[in-house]
From Swiss-Prot:
Gene Ontology terms for molecular function: 4 iron, 4 sulfur cluster binding; cyclic pyranopterin monophosphate synthase activity; GTP 3',8'-cyclase activity; GTP binding; metal ion binding; S-adenosyl-L-methionine binding
Role this protein plays: Catalyzes the cyclization of GTP to (8S)-3',8-cyclo-7,8-dihydroguanosine 5'-triphosphate.
Chloroplast recorded as keyword: no
Name listed for the protein in its UniProt record: Probable GTP 3',8-cyclase
Catalysed conversion reaction: GTP + AH2 + S-adenosyl-L-methionine = (8S)-3',8-cyclo-7,8-dihydroguanosine 5'-triphosphate + 5'-deoxyadenosine + L-methionine + A + H(+)
SMART domains cross-referenced by the UniProt entry: Elp3
The Radical SAM core domain, residue ranges: 4-227
Record key words, sorted: 4Fe-4S, GTP-binding, Iron, Iron-sulfur, Lyase, Metal-binding, Molybdenum cofactor biosynthesis, Nucleotide-binding, S-adenosyl-L-methionine
Record organism: Methanococcus maripaludis (strain C5 / ATCC BAA-1333)
Organism lineage: Archaea, Methanobacteriati, Methanobacteriota, Methanomada group, Methanococci
Sites where the protein binds [4Fe-4S] cluster 1: 20, 24, 27
Recorded name of the encoding gene: moaA
């Protein structure tokens, strides 16, 4: 199904918990800054995802908080697995990944994205307020070992991390991971000074790239191949291209459909209709009708 701007719905991002085992100072909490409501059950998540297939969803991304804190995560994955779904991936900080990688693979997870903003142990501990970078590295190694690939490393480009980019690139090249460089969205005014423009970084990468590809169904993102390393950029801020080609809807941890990453004022309750035994199609239709580009071309 297309929205009124002609954008197909192909991807569904599920936040399954607001809780996290780290306290990264920059976290935007998937656009939900306050904890409220109760978590959806594995069964409810499964029913909501199965309903989304009618509207064209073919890719699922599981996120949090930290999704590995849900002890029923393998059950959630099993419940959403369907032959119509081409890809189920998960975004994690990697702290618990070594322990659970095999169980997730066995449940039907295809691949993982792991957040890693620095390779400096002390800086990592400072950014995450106590995180152990060695646990993350071991988790990445285990994920690759069990076949949760292609593994992506999510690098958040900020004023305090950008000097780590060359080392992160070398690390990803060495382990065979894809590097995703993400623009920082400051959700609070006091964090604005950490934002940097990633356009010049992308321009430099483009100059050195051996090949450049365009991902049509991922906001027309460019993918750069440079010395054997795949690099992608995610630039949601003031980016008309990002919004114009968006194919994703979202589900909050407490069961609301979220038409736009950057808005929190047009959510559509879907979990209570599920709990009441209602047909959820009209709620998906309402969500899709609410979609409009946050950043529009002038």
């Amino acid at each position: 199904m297309e929205d009124r701007y002609g954008r197909e719905i192909r991807s569904f991002r599920l936040s399954i918990t607001p809780k996290c085992n780290l306290k990264c100072f920059y976290c935007h909490k998937e656009g939900r800054n306050e904890e409220h409501g109760k978590l959806m059950s594995a069964d409810e998540i499964g029913k909501i995802v199965k309903s989304s297939l009618e509207f064209g969803v073919r890719k699922i991304k599981i996120s949090g908080g930290e999704p590995l804190l849900r002890t029923d995560l393998p059950e959630i994955i099993e419940n959403i697995k369907d032959e119509q779904i081409k890809d189920i991936s998960l975004t994690t900080n990697g702290i618990l990944l070594e322990k659970y990688a095999q169980k997730l693979k066995d449940a039907g997870l295809d691949r993982v994205n792991v957040s890693l903003d620095t390779l400096n142990p002390e800086q990592y501990k400072k950014i995450t307020v106590g995180g152990n970078i060695e646990s993350v590295k071991k988790g990445i190694e285990k994920a690759i070992e069990v076949g949760l690939t292609p593994l992506k490393v999510n690098f958040l480009a900020m004023d305090c991390t950008v000097n780590q980019l060359p080392a992160i690139m070398d690390y990803c090249r060495k382990i065979g991971a894809i590097l995703q460089i993400i623009e920082f969205i400051p959700m609070e005014p006091e964090l604005k000074h950490h934002h940097i423009d990633v356009v010049p970084i992308e321009e430099e990468i483009a100059k050195s790239a051996d090949q450049v590809f365009t991902r049509k169904f991922m906001q027309n993102r460019k993918k750069y191949l440079i010395d054997g390393l795949e690099v992608e950029f995610v630039r949601p801020m003031d980016n008309t291209e990002f919004c114009e080609h968006c194919t994703r809807i979202r589900l909050t941890y407490d069961g609301y459909l979220k038409p736009c990453l950057l808005r929190d004022d047009n959510l559509v309750d879907v979990v209570n209709p599920v709990r009441n035994g209602e047909d959820t199609r009209k709620y998906f239709i309402k969500c899709i009708e609410e979609r409009e580009p946050f950043c529009k071309a002038q």
